[in-house]
Amino acid sequence: VNGLLNRTDGKILPIGLIPAGSGNSVLHDLDLITPAKAARAIIAGNTRFIDVAQIQMNHLLTYSINLIGWGLVTDVGKRSEAFRWLGPSRYTLSSIIEIFLRKTRKARLVIDQKTIVGQFSFIAACNSVHVGKGMKMAPSAELSDGLIDLLTVEGDITRRRLLSVLPKLFDGTHVNEPEVTYYQASSFSLYPETDDTLNIDGELLGTTPIDVSVLKHAI
């Protein structure tokens, strides 16, 4: 996606997607979760537009079609690198460790001109419903609606409540919990007190602060 949007000639080409990763989140949204089904869609020439989130950092411009995560979302990704030998289970172990550490960060979050200042456990901005391996992080998200869906867990949430809320990510019912706030926006900015690494489409990349805007039907 980054290579396509950085073309100097501005030409946009169709992208064929075949699931070969560990999560295949966007393909879950497209209902193309098997290689055979994805290949048939490509052969048939089935195309559709997808929005892209443009992320401006201090010295980097990058793009996302799935997830921009900050806080606990990134901490789990960082810690899991030490447990790669565990396979997919490394994320479960890393999540438990980070829940018990219960780190929060102070930040200013601006969502379509609305400003929120406070302590956050994590913020996740999603273009797709699914993140990771089948988690329904943003159940109201649409790949081509011109909006990005943000979830925040604010305040001093307890370990017990985190352990209760996070498993509900798999069926999307976490959005009904009082500690979770759900927004839809065309742009947002995040300014933490300290610079932190981000989780962008499953990769640890860049640092805050960031300014994000949705490029509707960019690919």
Q: For each predicted feature, which ranges?
A:
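ATP/nucleoside-binding phosphotransfer catalytic cores, i.e., glycine-rich phosphate-binding loops
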Residues: I111, V117, E142, T152-I219
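Short acidic/glycine-rich loop or secondary-structure boundary segments that cap or lie
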Residues: V73-V76, V117-Q119, V131-G134, T158-R161
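Glycine-rich phosphate/pyrophosphate-binding beta-alpha loops
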Residues: G69, A124-A138, L204
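A generic structural signal for well-ordered coil/turn residues at beta-strand boundaries
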Residues: F49, S64, K103-R105, Q119, ...
